């Protein structure tokens, strides 16, 4: 049986990433699923991306909102009263983007918004967080019920749904469908 490690929302925390990757190595993980947000907030964006690149043969990664800001730009309304981000957050994103090499930016540009893979006969849907029709993250639900999970992922044909973004963990199972945050 294949061993899969799941990470998400690393946020440029190279120390935590190295600790997790060391544990993955000890237990001989075959694949690493990363649900995005490898950059942003933390102080080591370049080092974090480079460390993940060393594992790219094992890595299945999707784009989080922090990678989306790098690739598509920050929200346009940052200087008005309805802004979605504080000025400090904007400064952090700009600083993070300035610290990334072209090599790292090219690596990040390859991340899909979502991915469906099949492992051992199971379809696995991977996303940072389910998106609405505008491509933005739906309303955050920190500890979703099974009913909320079913609504979040309605219309997607998969056996296992893996996501992040909320910085919490949960596992729900119903009718042989697994929802892993």
Language-model region placement:
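Histidine-centered catalytic micro-motifs
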Residues: 9-10, 126-131, 161-169
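Conserved beta-sheet core of the metallophosphoesterase superfamily
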Residues: 143-181
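Hydrophobic/aromatic beta-strand patches that form the interior of the parallel beta-sheet core
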Residues: 33, 60-62, 125, 160-162, ...
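Active-site-proximal segments of metal-dependent phosphoesterases and phosphodiesterases across multiple
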Residues: 83-87, 121-156
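Beta-strand-turn-beta hairpins that frame and shape the catalytic cleft
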Residues: 2-4, 116-125, 174-179
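Short, acidic/polar N-cap/turn motifs at the starts of alpha helices
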Residues: 112-116, 168-169
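Core catalytic region of metal-dependent phosphoesterases/phosphodiesterases
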Residues: 3-7, 12-109
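Short, solvent-exposed loop/turn segments at secondary-structure junctions
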Residues: 41-42, 134, 170
């Amino acid at each position: 049986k294949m061993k899969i490690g799941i990470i998400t929302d690393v946020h440029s925390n190279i120390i935590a990433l190295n600790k997790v990757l060391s544990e993955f190595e000890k237990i001989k993980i075959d694949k690493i699923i990363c649900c995005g947000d490898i950059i942003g907030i933390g102080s080591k964006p370049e080092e974090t991306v480079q460390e993940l690149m060393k594992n790219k043969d094992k890595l299945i990664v999707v784009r989080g909102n922090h990678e989306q800001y790098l690739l598509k730009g920050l929200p346009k309304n940052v200087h008005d009263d309805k802004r979605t981000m504080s000025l400090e957050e904007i400064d952090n994103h700009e600083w993070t983007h300035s610290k990334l090499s072209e090599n790292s930016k090219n690596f990040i540009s390859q991340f899909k918004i979502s991915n469906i893979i099949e492992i051992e006969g199971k379809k696995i849907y991977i996303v940072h967080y389910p998106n609405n029709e505008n491509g933005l993250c739906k309303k955050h639900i920190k500890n979703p019920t099974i009913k909320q999970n079913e609504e979040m992922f309605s219309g997607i044909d998969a056996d296992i749904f893996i996501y992040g973004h909320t910085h919490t963990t949960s596992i729900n199972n119903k009718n042989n469908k697994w929802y892993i945050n």
